[in-house]
A protein has these predicted regions:
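Conserved short hydrophobic interaction patches
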Residues: 12-13, 68-72, 76, 112-126
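Charge-rich, low-complexity N-terminal segments
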Residues: 1-38
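Hydrophobic residues embedded in beta-strands of well-ordered beta-sheets
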Residues: 26-27, 46, 91-93
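Short, well-structured hydrophobic secondary-structure segments
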Residues: 37-58
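Short, internal acidic amphipathic alpha-helical interface segments
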Residues: 53-92, 96
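Short, highly charged C-terminal tails/helix-capping segments
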Residues: 128-161
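Well-ordered alpha/beta subsegment
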Residues: 90-114, 118, 125-136
Length: 161
């Protein structure tokens, strides 16, 4: 399915606003709550994604964080089959959702976008608590120096914003 056709489907949306896809197949939309919603057209689907957290140096210092996220991800249930993806290069954890482009209609596309928007933020909030818990639990067990604990407290404060 080509970008022009996908953009024409977007114009038929009644309840959700998404920006048009650019020539590279990517759309970026700032939602009412301030979050950025990204969408990407692939050969088989339109993938929606939102950033959960950039782990930065903490990714190397706490390799258990992503496995903790996977163990707590609750895939397939409460959050309507959203999934998490970790980009090791940028150390960003993403929440993703795919809509098959086979027989894609404006209604089906809009319903998928609504489902993602409705479920992504509660899922992101949940995952951020897992990240924070992972950092704090590891510190209490391993006796990490207080300066690192303070740094993780800053991360907790940042995640609470």
């Amino acid at each position: 399915m080509d970008i022009i056709h996908i953009n024409n489907l977007l114009k038929q949306f009644k309840r959700v606003h998404l920006n048009d896809f650019l020539e590279n197949g990517i759309s970026t939309t700032r939602l009412n709550d301030g979050n950025e919603l990204y969408a990407n057209i692939t050969d088989k689907s339109v993938m929606f994604f939102m950033s959960v957290e950039k782990l930065g140096d903490n990714a190397e210092d706490h390799p258990n964080v992503f496995s903790d996220l996977l163990a707590a991800a609750m895939a397939g249930g409460k959050f309507s089959n959203l999934r998490i993806v970790y980009d090791k290069e940028t150390t960003i954890v993403w929440v993703c959702y795919d809509i098959s482009i086979d027989h894609l209609t404006a209604d089906r596309f809009e319903e998928g976008a609504e489902c993602f928007i409705e479920n992504a933020q509660p899922y992101i909030d949940y995952l951020r608590t897992v990240i924070t818990s992972s950092f704090l639990d590891e510190n209490s067990v391993t006796g990490v120096p207080q300066s690192n604990v303070n740094g993780m407290s800053n991360i907790h404060n940042f995640l609470s914003i």
